[in-house]
Amino acid sequence: MKKLTALFLSLLLVLTMTAALAETDITLWTFPIGDWGNSEKVDEMLAAFNAVHPDIKVTVEYLDYTNGDAQITTAIEAKTTPDIVMEGPERLVANWAAAGKMLPLNDLWTDETIADINANNASVVATCQGADGNYYMYPLCMTAHCMVINKTAFEAADAMQYIDQETHTWTTEGFENALRALVNAGYFPTGLIYCSGQGGDQGTRALVTNLYDGRFTNEEHTLYTMDSEANIKGLTKLQELANEGLITFDASINGGEEIALFVNGTSQMAFCWNAAQVANNKDKLADGIELFPMAFPSEDGVPRLDGGVWGFGLFDNGDDEKVAA
């Protein structure tokens, strides 16, 4: 919490250091990333900040992955975007910054900062950098995306035999056998393949690519490769599983809604999961569900996991003082 608060305060000070003697209003919009979707936790950080800077008022709006993108788009069109927004590089850098809506944060990216981040994960620096070489995101946290199963149901269906419980991995064949065991034991729906929106696409994408060692892009990240032979084979396998009644395609839901259906006990696994979801859903979990995180199934049982990085970016709202800061 202390580290997150310090990083958050540094961004606020970027916005306010030229107007320190006057009252300043800052708007912050945040997607539900860990405790940043928890108003009580955010209020604690703001209280700590205001104890030092009582002249700076921060107004927070909490977005979700169902309507958040539309709210940002509407705000951009109406020129009412917030000062600060918290999300990941796929939105901050690849979307809004590429459209010229964000402020460069190069002043925050000192040699010391870059060295510190590289010491933890060398890929993070590049994800925060736009094609023009400027930095548009300041990272706060990262985690690996995975899936999760209801261990209670798997044990009742004798499906845990298809899982390496020590490494939390399974093969594509083991995944199929586990689905069949669940259905035969009366646990249906097993898993839900969703696609109503962008939210949670990291889950279904990783499911498809891992099944037969496919890739989402080429090594240079200049070309999407979802139409590769390996990925077509993965999509075909999922269609076969659906035709057999072992898994369900539901085009009406997104990743957040899939999580909700898992948490309330409707389905027995979720493909859109990470460590933050444990905290987000601990008070919503239906009785009898035992969470057991899993890597995505792969042909040889050795998965490739994608990491998620989240942080802050600043919208360019045309305020000369804020731009100068």
Explain the meaning of each model-derived region.
Residues 62-71, 90-91, 168-174, 250-264:
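Short helix-initiation/N-cap motifs at beta->coil->alpha
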Residues 31, 38, 46, 94, ...:
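Extracytoplasmic/periplasmic substrate-binding proteins
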Residues 1-8:
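Positively charged n-region of N-terminal signal peptides that target proteins for export
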Residues 6, 20-99, 111-117, 161, ...:
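Conserved N-terminal structural module of periplasmic/extracytoplasmic solute-binding proteins
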Residues 51, 109-113, 126-199, 214-252, ...:
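Helix-loop-helix "hinge/cap" segment bordering the ligand-binding cleft or interdomain interface
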Residues 76-87, 101-103, 188, 264-273:
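Alpha-to-beta junction loops
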Residues 13-17, 21:
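Hydrophobic core
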Residues 88-146, 173, 203, 207-209, ...:
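Hinge/lid segment of periplasmic solute-binding proteins
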